[in-house]
Amino acid sequence: ASRGQALEGYSPLAEVELTASTDLTVPVQKFTAIPEGAQQLACYQDGALITSLIYTIPAEKRARLGEKLYSFGSVSDVHIPTNDGDDFRRALAFFKEYGCSFVGISGDIANDGSEAQLQMYQKIIAPYEESMPVYVSAGNHDAQGGGLNRTQWEKYTGHPQQFMVEEPSSGDIFIFLGDNNWPNSSNNQTVLTMAQINWLAEQLEKYKDRRVYLYQHVFLADTCGDVYDAAGNPVYGVWFRPDRAEENAYRDLMRKYNNVTWFSGHSHWKFHLQSNNDALNVFDGDGEYCQMVHNPSLTVPRDYIDGKRIEDSANSEGYIVDVYKDYTILRGYDFENGQYYAYATYA
């Protein structure tokens, strides 16, 4: 809040049931950032401010970020032709109006990897080709049915399966690493090949003194990107498995290079489900790993209700990322209702 008014354009930080004379603790994810302009924490009931429940944020805790260097949009799991691509069009228009320099997508632009779907993707991004490039890493849906068709992929996305881009104003490095195959039922059908991982290792070593943003679709087990049930069991399967050599090699790179911020996707889980698993959206294993960020789905975010996975094609989620000299600020965004999620704003 600011001066007793809810911060414009943001969701509540939390919604809780208060009982008189009872203490209540509201957990906050450790990477949570105080939005710029916020001066207070305030409680509201039915839209009305409770004046006895206002906390002034100390001046030294308020956001002082300095000059913004650039911004980019970050989304995942577009799954064209879901919703006829309208969610994708709306997101790109929003990113353009916001002033994003480019957009990163962490996989699954096509629902079944067909040429027709890739053609539709190309048509949607065409108006932004010069002013706001769209970069994408292939996901499992893009690579199904015999593996990624690299010729078609490069033709319609404009980029190879793996590539890097340097942001000119900062020297920051963006690496995009595409999935190799789906399904992954044998040793010859791997999410990533060892050749890809060796290429990635070369890039990370080369740019170890730079800020690096990595896009790769499938998250690692027991890190970020998944929701857990009450017994602590994962409810979304991941075949990038710890019993595979390529997974181990990739995981070691995520441990070694803490200058990396890795954007994954794949599970579609909504931002709010971090209430089930604190590590769902952002995770670093208390410093064991680089910073890992999970992008929810732009077109079919998934909810988890009464132990069941629910597809919600009426919603649409992603990130605005603002980059400063000393900070990267991620703000989860609700494209359907046009607001930032205060509980999914991270540094």
Q: What is the meaning of each model-derived region?
A:
Residues 74-76, 102-108, 133-140, 177, ...:
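Active-site neighborhood of phospho(di)ester-bond hydrolases with catalytic His/Asp-centered motifs
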Residues 115-207, 237, 249-256, 272-300, ...:
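Extended active-site neighborhood of metal-dependent phosphoesterases/phosphodiesterases
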Residues 189-191, 207-264:
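Active-site-proximal segments of metal-dependent phosphoesterases and phosphodiesterases across multiple
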Residues 10-29:
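Aromatic sugar-binding surface patches on proteins
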Residues 60-66, 310-347:
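A short C-terminal boundary segment appended to hydrolase-like catalytic domains
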Residues 56-119:
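N-terminal active-site segment of His-dependent metallophosphoesterases
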Residues 40-44:
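Extracellular recognition modules
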Residues 30-37:
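Surface-exposed, short loops/turns at beta-strand junctions within beta-sandwich domains
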